[in-house]
Structure formats: structure tokens, C-alpha cells
Amino acid sequence: MNSSAQPSRRIASNLLWTPQGLLRNPLVGVAADGRILSVGTCPEPDRCPGTEFYAGVLAPGLVNAHCHLELSYLLGAIPERCGFAGFAGAMSQVRERFSAEQRVQAVEAADAAMWQAGIEAVGDISNGDTAFAVKSRSRIAYHTFVEFFGLRAASAEHLLPLLRHPQTSLTPHSLYSVQDAPLRAIAARGDAPLSIHFMESPGEAALFEHRGPLWEWYAKAGFSCDFLHYGSPAERLVACVPHDRRVTLVHDCCITQRDIDIVMGHFTAPVWWCLCPRSNRYISGLEPPVELLRRNRLNICLGTD
């Protein structure tokens, strides 16, 4: 990439991460507004006037494909390895301990930490308006997935105020927490990508077999599900979401080859499989089957959750 404009910075390093692979001894010209003006090589950066050298690997800005920025205040507040159902239950117990000011401060700190770590774009999940002010003035580019959640919620009307914010779109939380009519309505609405929690725990597949911790939790709480006849989360996904809708499936810890075959046999639009390994280790100790995804040559992205 070359340009007639003069760079305000020249940055050299040992390696540069490019779409074509690693480039040795790179020299990158950067404009004052952050645009990349040129990419070349400089084996001896000491002999290149005005050049900054950083040992290591230069990389483009990173994308955090799945984040719950508004929940940043919960960092360290919930015990490790309590399982998904335990984690969800603990959230409702501890969230009232934090003031609105503490929540906003945690959002600001998390936003700053992501920028410092090289993240320049985030797919953020929102159930409320806590984080929007911070996102509006952040240097990070955010797309906010306004999340529809709840087995007793029949429509997304209560989420309309959140959808008035810039760069937002509606998405269902998961295939186990939304009844059939709202899931189908959301999937048929617009053309923005959907970001769906998928196979984070064994309980998701077990629910469709009328067993497991989610089934027991729902039974105890008096929840009924009108979607268990699909047989599995993957089969429900392809039955309810049009084939040409872009989808990001988040977590994927418990997917099987059959799940992959069902999903990829349906969608003609891109499907991204988003892994959040640190979150999974903290909550359940599970890890996604990375080699299975790689063997199938699937699109993999990363999130912090």
C-alpha cells in the first residue's frame, strides 16, 4: 500500500501481521489521523531517519466480537467455576450491591483497557442504557446488539428506546431463553448480523431432551418452553433463522460435528464462530473445540464476554 501523502510517523518492527502472512522487517507509514499510508521493509531501522522501532509483532487493530460492557462491574464479584446456571443465579444476587456510579466507572475502565490492549472495534451486548454514553465518546468503534431475553417476553417493544441509539440492532440472547414467536420475528427483521449465545454449556442440548440443569431451573421457576420440539439448538436455529442472515454463534464449547453440519448446511450468508475462552474457563472450566472448528475451516473470531 502506497500513498503520495507524507506519513507523520514511520514505525518499524521485527514482524508485521498481514492478511498474506508475517512480513519481516516491516516499515509502516502512518498518517496523522491513523490511516496506514505505506507498508514496506527496512532491515536496518537505525539507518531510517525518524523511525520508531518496536520489538515484536505489529498487528492491525483487534476486534472484540462479543462483549458485555455494561456488566464490567461484575468483574471478580462472582465465584469461579460455579457453572452457567450458578453464574446466572449469582448475577441476580450481586448486581444490586453496585451503584449506578460504580457501574459507569467500571464501563469507563473496561473501555480504556480495551483500547490500551489494541482493540479498535467491539460487538457489544446491551440489555440497558448504562454503557451508551461511554461508547458514544470512545475511540473504539462499537456495534451494539440490543439483546432480547426472557421466556415470558412476547415482543421487543420494551427495547425500542435502546434501538434509537446509533449503530444498534436487535438480537436474541440464545436458543434456550426466547420463545418461538419473538425469535422468528427478530430473525425476520432487518439484515444486521445476529449474535447468539450458542452451546455454551451441556445444559443447552439437554434442555431439548427435557433434562439437565436448565430444564430443572425452568421447571422450578415455572417457565415453559414452546420450542423443545425442534430437538436441538442447532435444529432450532436453522428452522427459525433465514439462510441468508449473517450470524455470529458465541461460545460453542459443546458443539459437535453434527451441529456444524446442520448449521453450515443451512446458511448461505457468513457464519462466525466466536470463542470466549477466558470467560468459559472462569464460569465452567469448559473450552471450545478449536481443532474441530479448524478442521471444518470455519470462520473463527474472539470475544471477551
What feature does the model see in each segment?
Residues 71-105, 143-146, 201-245, 266-270:
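Active-site gating loops and adjacent loop-to-helix segments of metal-dependent hydrolytic enzymes
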Residues 173-184, 224-305:
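Active-site-adjacent C-terminal substructures of enzyme catalytic domains
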Residues 120, 159-193:
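Active-site gating/metal-coordination segments in enzymes
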